[in-house]
Amino acid sequence: MEGLKTLGPCGHPHPQCPPTPASSSHGGGLDQPCQGFVGWPCLGPISSAHSVQSQRPFPVPGAGGSGPTVEGEAPGLFLSSQEQRARDTEGPRQGDLEAGLGWGWPLHPGSNQGAPRQGGSIGSGTRPCPCPPLSREGGALASPRVALSQLQCGLLGSAEQSFLQLEQENHSLKRQNQELREQLGALLGPGQQFLPLCPEHSSCTALAWPPDPAGTQPLGNRAPLQLLRRELCQGQEAFVQQSQNELQQIRLCFERKKMVITEVWDNVAEMHMALNNQATGLLNLKKDIRGVLDQMEDIQLEILRERAQCRTRARKEKQMASMSKGRPKLGSSKGLAGQLWLLTLRLLLGALLVWTAAYVYVVNPTPFEGLVPPLLSRATVWKLRALLDPFLRLKVDGFLPF
């Protein structure tokens, strides 16, 4: 079982190693030194053969190997001033290194806690193991398991840095993709759809996470990164290579889509400029048409004015001509003949009236019985009676209506 979590020399909490009984094979020799603190939790359960070590830290300097120790005692808790200063200087340096890398816990398997430091990191791009070095009291040499754990620590450190870089690039790409989607949505409108994702890259969406608006959650506590760590434990380099290839494909797809969007944007800008030019041309044409219509109205008004003036002038000329021609005809023979014809017509009309009256009075008044009463009023009839009373006969009196 794991012990209580204490603050290790690297500045991070680690569960302590469980205690083991004192060794009696060497005749009261020293206990085995502590193999460090249990590290990376994503590697799953740690075997008892690798993780169960002595709980005691380092032995007190000067104690040597004389005399056995009792279980429950902790003589290694009292350290000399030199070892304490060395450990204090070593701890902040490792803590600063881990803080620079951005990880919340030491990333090395629990079975490899006792790898000693040999002059810094193993290679370029790898981070050193944050656990304290092993004590080689009594001339004990490091086992092959320690060397293997040191190599795995270096590989895991480089892989973690690669995954951290991949995740940061993925996050930046998704942020750029979100911005491009917003721009494309504003460009296309509410009824349009976005371009679908490439079918070979649709499996990469499982590694994405929603953008954190606050941005306070560290990268090490995110679920996709823990999933990548578990997959890293199973297949390290192959998975890293596959991720790099997929990232390269995503970049290429992103560049292609970006070029297509840029072309579409250029075409839209050209269409917008063309529409603006057409609108300007239509406005100018409208102004020209209005000017032409105004000119046509002015021309029509001038034509009507000229026609009216011509008609008035012609009428005046005709009147003047008729007046100048009619004056010398008054004293001519044509005027005398006209007067004679007028006198003749008057005589004929008088004779017709006299003949009609004689016919009605003497011969037959029947045709005029229905015509004369409506034409003559009562007063006219009485006047006619008074005028014709000396000449009236019975027949004529019956003809009159009153």
Swiss-Prot record:
Protein's UniProt keywords contain Transmembrane helix: yes
UniProt key word Ligase: no
Stretches assigned to coiled coil: 154-189
Chief subcellular location: membrane
Keywords for the protein's UniProt record, in alphabetical order: Coiled coil, Membrane, Transmembrane, Transmembrane helix
Membrane topology summary: Single-pass membrane protein
Annotated TM spans: 347-363
Superkingdom: Eukaryota
Any one annotated GO CC term: membrane
Segments of this protein annotated with the region Disordered: 1-30, 50-74, 108-131
InterPro entries: SMCO2/5
Subcellular localization: Membrane
Protein name: Coiled-coil domain-containing protein 188
GN (gene name): CCDC188
